[in-house]
Amino acid sequence: MSGHSKFANIKHKKEKNDAAKGKIFTKIGKEIAVAVKEGGSSDPSNNSRLRDVIAKAKSNNMPNDTIERNIKRASGDMSAANYEHITYEGYGPNGTAIIVETLTDNKNRTASNVKNAFTKGSGNVGTPGCVSFMFDKKGQIVIDKEEYEGVADELMMQVLDAGAEDFVEEEDSFEVLTDPDDFSAVRLAMEEAGIPMVSAEVTMIPQTYVELTDPKDIANIQKTLDMLDDDDDVQDVYHNWDE
């Protein structure tokens, strides 16, 4: 199967230099802590949420010893229970839709920072649900196309048999889409089958994309996304800007 899908643009990610990697690892460490607390176990085999966060960590090249250290720390750190999941939705230039997922121990601080990021980019925070209907929540697994040159059909049958909803061929990759509830099982089946994955996580995929042509609009949305990326409380940012 083939189709229009921009997996590289679904989530805004800046170039991963050392400083950016450090910030990403810190945010994932927070997710690991919350997954251990809310999942009730530090054992990934008994905690599907923790398994998913570990997959996300590996997709971001987080070293195994760093992952293990975060899990061990979370097992004896009750402060993670104070973090709250809060999702913000809003609009950027020309009606672009932006979803911001946060983990925070200070709602007022986070709300103020997120609002400021939207305002600085000439956008605004909206009400819950104002843009989320424009996205589909899916498990998304990306495979390097070079690994399966000439055997795409066999790979497609393998992942569909594992429970995937769709198999999309892109220019440089194959993209496997799953129902969020099936993501862990599909990812595990692919892992056990020895299928190498570039990335694997549950994400929000835009149903349509908005193109920006005005340089001012592009600068504004970039400013908003950069400010959100730099906020320690922000875990993930999804948007429908056709970069």
State where each predicted segment sits.
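N-terminal cationic and glycine-rich segments that engage phosphates or anionic surfaces
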Residues: 1-126, 130-142, 239-242
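Positively charged, low-complexity, intrinsically disordered RNA-binding extensions
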Residues: 140-243
